[in-house]
Amino acid sequence: MVNKNLKVAVLGAGAMGCLFGGLLAEKGLSVVLIDVWKDHVDEINNKGLKMMGHGGDRTVKIKATTDPKTLQPVDAIIIMCKATALEKALTNSKNIIGDKTMLMSFQNGIGHEEIMQNIAGKDKVLGGSTTQASSIQGPGIIQNHASLPSWIGEYDGGHSQRVKDLAETFTSHGLETIAEEDIKRRKWMKLFALTAIGPLSAIFDLHHTDLYISNKNQKMSRNLGKEIILETREVAKADGVDVSEKDCLEMFNRIVDSRQTNKSSMAFDVLTVSYTHLRAHET
């Protein structure tokens, strides 16, 4: 059932947080963006969020803040901050978590949900995954690189009415979302793709089409990509998710064939001498 009165907070208003929040707000949901980048937040509040690319260039009116303490509890929290900032950001935002608030992370990688469960409680945390792509063009400006689906599901698996209702609500408000029975497997399938793109893209400073199609060393690149995916498969098995070698290689071939021209976030992190997502899982 679609809930037109759903109140949403997006924790982390970078490229993807602004994309998700902007799409939902554009279609009428109550959405607030939370981020520490004051210039970005001020630009959004003063001039609106400028969204370019897929769907056409337009400006969306949406609320943004650097201080979650000023907010009331919401129905759903979409987490899009850097993995390295997750624990601190969510702890600082505990006041917006109500008795029935649902939290979901669309961050890349595995392990975010366990951090969220420790802070908010296991019963409130869903899993999420997305194939959307976006980039920041400047304060208050994003570029939408794709109009592709996202998935949410109970983190331990199975069906639930709350997931079905939330997926329908997001979809009816501009963010195509599918209720997924096995969200953990879905997240691992996304991670297979990321491990084949992110590290090599960062090392060679190439976007993914140049990496696998249009460079003279593409054979070497493809062999490395396949080896990385198959090694990732072994890690997934240790986490209880068994994906066949055939499915892994089919995933890799889809990556090569998709001819995306955006660089990985890891490549941008290396270029700007920022911490990559990997730092969040160091011990």
Mark where each language-model region is.
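Rossmann-fold dinucleotide-binding core
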Residues: 106-190, 196
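Active-site-proximal catalytic alpha-helix in oxidoreductases
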Residues: 184-211, 220-233, 258-261
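Conserved small/polar residues in nucleotide/adenosyl-binding loops
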Residues: 276-283
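C-terminal substrate-binding/catalytic lobe of Rossmann-fold NAD(P)-dependent oxidoreductases
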Residues: 221-228, 233-275
